[in-house]
Amino acid sequence: MLSNENLNSEEIIRELCACNGLSFEKIRQDGPATTTLEMFFSGYPKMAGLSYFPNLTQLILVGQNIHCIAGLESCHFLKELWITECHLSKIQGLHHCADLQKLYLYHNEISVIEGLENLLKLEVLWLNNNQINVIEGLDMMQNLKELNLANNLIHSIGESLDPNVQLERLNLSGNKISSFKELTNLARLPSLMDLGLKDPQYSPNPVCLLCNYAIHVLYHIPQLQRLDTYDVSEKQIKNLAESTVVKKIMYYNMRMKNNQRQQREELEKVRERTSKAKQVPENRIRALSFLVKNLEHELTDMKSSGNMQANIPISNKFHENNCDTEESNSQQSSERRKNNSDRLEQIHKKICALKERMIFWTRKLSEVEKHHEEKCRRMKDSFHLLDQFLQTELETVGNVRFEEGTAADSWFKSCYDLIVSRFCAMNFRAYGISGIKIHRIVRVHNRILRLKFEDKVQYWMDNEDLYTTESYKKKLEYLFYIFDPKLPIDKKELLHVLENGCNITRSSQLPEQEQVEAVLLTNSMSLCEGPRLEFLQKQAMNKSCDPEAFKDGIIVIAKVFLGRSVKARDDLPIKPNNYAKVNSVYRLQKFANSTFNSLNDEICSSKEHGNCDCSLRQCEWLVFDHEFILPEYVVEFEYISMEKSSGFVTPSNENAEDVSHDLKLDEDAIALEPFLKPKPKIISLDEKTVLSVARANIYSQITVLNLHGNSLSKLKDISRLNGLRKLIISFNEFSSLEDVSYLTNLEYLDASHNQVITLEGFKGLGKLKYLDLSWNKLTNSREDLHILRKHAIQLSSLDIRYNFWQKPASVLKDTIAILPSLTHLNGVTITEDEISEALQISSGSRITQASLLINARTDTVKPRCLNLLPSAQILAQFSKNCLDPNAELSNSWYTKITSLTLDSQNLVRITNLEKLVNLRWASFSSNHLTKIEGLEHCVNLEELNLDDNSISKLEGLSKLTKLRRLSINNNLLAGFDRHVIESLSHLHFLSAENNNISSLAGLQRGYKLIELYLSNNCISSNQEIYSLKGLNNLVILDMWGNPILLKHENYRLFVIFHLSAIKALDGVAVEPSECENAKDMFGGRLTSDMIAERIGHQRFTELQDLNWRTSSIRSIDLVPADHFRNVQTVNLENNNLTSFSGLIFLPNIKNLYLNHNRIESILPQQKSQSHLTNRQILHQKVSSSGYGQQGTSKGSRDTVYGEALSPVMQSLEVLHLGYNGINSLPMLQLGRLRNLKSLYLQGNEISHVEGLENLQFLRELVLDHNRIKAIAETSFAKLNSLVSLNLEENRLRDLNNLPPLLKLRKLLIGSNKIQEISEIEKLEVIPALVELSISGNPISRKPFLRNLLVVRLQNLQILDGILITAEDRARAEMYFMEQQSLTVPNAVMDLGNPVSTMIVSKPLPLRVTNFPLAGGAHHSLGADLHFNNGHEDIFQNEANKYKKLKNYTVGVGHNPQNTQDIALRQLRGGTHFPASYLTQQSGQARSQQKHPFNQENEGRCV
């Protein structure tokens, strides 16, 4: 046999030599010189003959049938080894190859990585295409640079690669990695540059099929250059991954804040219920305590009056129950002694009875508080679970998502009905449970498990040809997952189940027949919860379990594919090997180990089932493959207990009968004799009153003073009682104890049941030994305790119960630590253990070198992990870069510290950090800090957490210019220091929730802020939002729980409008529709807040002018209007107003400028058109339709715009409404402005002048640049005060209906369409006219017009902007005299009636010709002016018309007025002017009336 093996080895070696070009015969000579051997595809079944090649450096064996590695003992210089596709099953025999650098073992059957411990120089290792399940055995390979483990069976990475810090290339494609958490382990490989998880040559890992896979990898491994063979070295790609993750962290942080807010709201509800439950005990304690102190006061009076012996023991506290009496004064008579003794005994007996009742109610109160604390604890645990859900969502980048259901969700109702149907009250009767109340249902969306579930089911169905879709559905079931009943449901276990799937129960410690290797589920609530309740009930009997633990529970509902299922056999353990080709087994309820199985028959026949499905089979299911189970719902519930059921009665469940019985016992105790008469209350103290109460003659005699039960709030001159040793001031109204200061002999002070809020001013009580401060309103425990430590150094007994402490949990320990002289606290003796514990806590209240070594970390890079905790806390939990407390430390060890976490260390001050110059992340939450100090040298600090302290100011942060994140929740901040925020130029995250902040003024320069959390503060004014308008980077704002939300109805839209960059407000994303609604509501809205923002204060009464030109204002809301009572001028030109809006409420406004707006009316008009005629509607649609408002019926106008409308803005005198597009004056309702004096309406589209009848005081009216065609009868009829009227640039053809405006002095009608000279006559009805403009009309082309008007209108002083001088007037009169001499000789008429020849009915045309006129009599008319011959027959038809004119004389032609008439009639015929004359006239400048905004014209009346 041995010879055969040698023969085979020889043949193998010969084949080896042949394949490598070597001679077998010369192998001994040539072998040492050979460095490389190669064997491909058979011919080398085992590793033989390698000893002939001691200097071999490369060995390549491919496609052989080698099962083990051997024969390398002499290959000490081997550097590269290939054994691939060789059926190799184990790694061995490499320990002699210490110089090996490259090892290729791919395509084999290796299942374990082993035998590589000595390969310290190995740089390349390929183990792909094997059967490896676990990454292991690589710890010693610190030089490894390339590792290929593709196409194996690896499920997890863990910490197995942490030692391989030089690893640059890693290929894990084709494995079973399904969790993002596993990939985060690769972030600890600092040199990793090339990673493969779904290499195209292999199938992808399940994790690669999840959303955001690449984003997750690139964020955690930023140095990566290639991912899955793709180049990812571009900075843009890394930035995209970074920004995506940052946004997700912001999003989940916001949701975490939402959870915390909901938690606070729920806790507040619990506190309200607790407060209600405490009312009865507290009221009873107060009433009973008041009576006890009255009786004790009576005892003191009896003693002081000499009616009883001295040294009678008086009990002053609840725990003192000494009811013995002493004998009466021997000096009194026996009868007197007996009466006094009886009364004394009655008083003591009643005091004892009342104190017993006080003890009872105190115990009740403690039970309520204990129940409250337990309820709060369980509620916090519930919300903490939601926080963990969010953390899981973030870590899985949304591939595991939790959706909290509401009644509106269809799945919520289905799940709810399922739970109710699977709950049978009969099954829970033994535990005192009558029902179930569901608090929360959370739906689990696990994309990872769902993919596994679907793949597994699909694979099963592919191998089961007989199964159809319908049969598949029948195999699906929703079942309850059963946790270990002996352990409470741990959050980690619950999260593990929801994220990674259900665990297979392995009960190997049980007897063989009871062993289970499967996932345990059930379709019954009783089978799911029964074992847990039984276990808790047993513990409750032993008093080792809180009865409240019964009430709350959590269940997981999973979708289960049962596959092939059979009934469990009694004789076989439930293991996969015992049930071949079976996916699940079930066992009916009778097999379950439950104490209530005997009730089964009763259950099935009971009528108390309600809607439960207990008639169905209740059984347990055991599923062998956990991938057939998909957790879908998490349900939090509470059991409803039966009345008076043991283990479930809580203080809040007590019925009215019990309370009535307890109250009756109180009344019985109160009814005991003696009955004390009520004493008159003392409201203020004076010397007489003090002496009377103390029953003394002088102050020096007073040692005891009892002022119990009065209405005192001050103790005037109490310091004069130098001998006072005991003072009782309970049941008064003191808010401070400053008045009792410097009572140097005072030993006993009872100030219970008052309103004391602080001990500030409490001084000079060096002998005080007893102090009762219970039932007050103290809040700051440490501050008040330090006052007592300083000013009451001998204090031995202190009662501080029932105050409003900010941190009640630490009050007792702080009190014992701060006041070392105390022996009794809250009526209980302080034990040595309590003193020791308090001193231990106190000793740790300073930052020492030891605490720094324990809590510091030295990481140089911020942790790249998806976690919502502060960076310092993340490093404290996960980082291993700690300082060694046992090592010898040099002076430079301080500079290595980059992270420090000192949470819950009872710190009072931040000290000893001067040397931490490289500190970047720090957390000091849950301490007793009152100010920020000691951080001045930590200039590199980037994150700072100061939550849960007592800090009131941000002082001490100014030098932290690199600070990026600041959290200061649950403190006492009242605002922000502008200089501090300005110095924090890189701050982008600020959380200051649960403080006392009322102003945001200091945040105006926090330009880099992205996230701002300010919930539960005291912000109440909208104006505070303006302080944030400059924060253009602000994306998330949370102000929930501030008064501003309740005070302002449209708060949300208001904030969205003013902070345009915001994406989420109060935990809710801002929708595009909300942005539109905000613009509609607040766009262009002038409010008090806007004005305050501009002027910098809210002293609106100082304002006289408001100038908001060109501000895009659409509405005005200045409330309260009385604050603007001194405003007289408002300029809102160039805005978007459609009405006067809120301006009508300004009481004293005089000048209003609204040019260039869109004013439609004084008040907003209704949109309805029901009152309009068809013509009016058509005109509104098409302004050129020509119908205008002429179709408006008189009745309709009177109804809508008539005089019945009440006056508004009665102080307004000047109104500018130019260029508003106004087409209807009645719609403006200007008649309501009764005291208006100047009205400017230029540049509109007005075609009819109406609706001004009520403006009786109007003096100036401007209507130029409109579309007025005619003057109606009523246009100016009642404007009797009108002084100036401007109608220029309109379409007037005549001046009909122009009323006799007696006061009108200025009329501008230029640039209209007036053609007829006859229209000039109509101006004569205006007697006071001083200024007239008529240029730009067709009539103005007539050359005689100016002379005519000058002569005709004798009072006229300015015409077309040119002053009329005396010379002008004389020239005009001369002209008409000459005109008369010209026209009279040419007239064909009778001398007896000369005037008739000058009266014509037809126009006498004048024409310009080139024919010169002989003579010079008419030089003033121009050399080229001639009359047409057409005048010869102008009198033929007029003779009869004027026959009645008989009384004229021959000299009538010399009358100036008649001369003007003659000239006027001649001008009616028309005149043609020569070009030279027109040129001359056009050269004359005519001033045009303009109407710009001018403060000088505000109250002008011409």
From Swiss-Prot:
Cysteines paired by S-S bonds: none
Is Membrane given among the entry's keywords? no
**PROSITE patterns according to UniProt:** LRR
Q: Sorted alphabetically, which Gene3D superfamilies does this protein's record hold?
A: Ribonuclease Inhibitor
Q: Which SUPFAM superfamilies match?
A: L domain-like (SSF52058), Outer arm dynein light chain 1 (SSF52075)
What InterPro entries does the entry give? Leu-rich_rpt, Leu-rich_rpt_4, Leu-rich_rpt_typical-subtyp, LRR_dom_sf, SDS22/Internalin_LRR
State one Pfam family annotation: LRR_8
| Keyword terms | Leucine-rich repeat, Repeat
Question: Key word Repeat present in the record?
Answer: yes
Bias kind Polar residues: ranges = 1479-1496
Swiss-Prot/TrEMBL LRR repeat ranges: 53-79, 97-119, 120-141, 142-164, 166-188, 224-247, 296-320, 699-721, 722-744, 746-764, 765-790, 792-814, 822-849, 894-916, 917-938, 939-960, 961-983, 985-1009, 1011-1030, 1031-1053, 1100-1123, 1124-1146, 1147-1170, 1209-1232, 1234-1255, 1256-1278, 1280-1301, 1302-1325, 1327-1351
Region entry Disordered, spans: 317-342, 1479-1502
- Read off the PANTHER family from this record: LEUCINE-RICH REPEAT AND IQ DOMAIN-CONTAINING PROTEIN 1-RELATED (PTHR46652), LEUCINE-RICH REPEAT-CONTAINING PROTEIN 9 (PTHR46652:SF3)
Q: Tell me what this protein is called.
A: Leucine-rich repeat-containing protein 9
Which species does the entry assign this protein to?
Xenopus tropicalis
**Gene encoding this chain?**
lrrc9
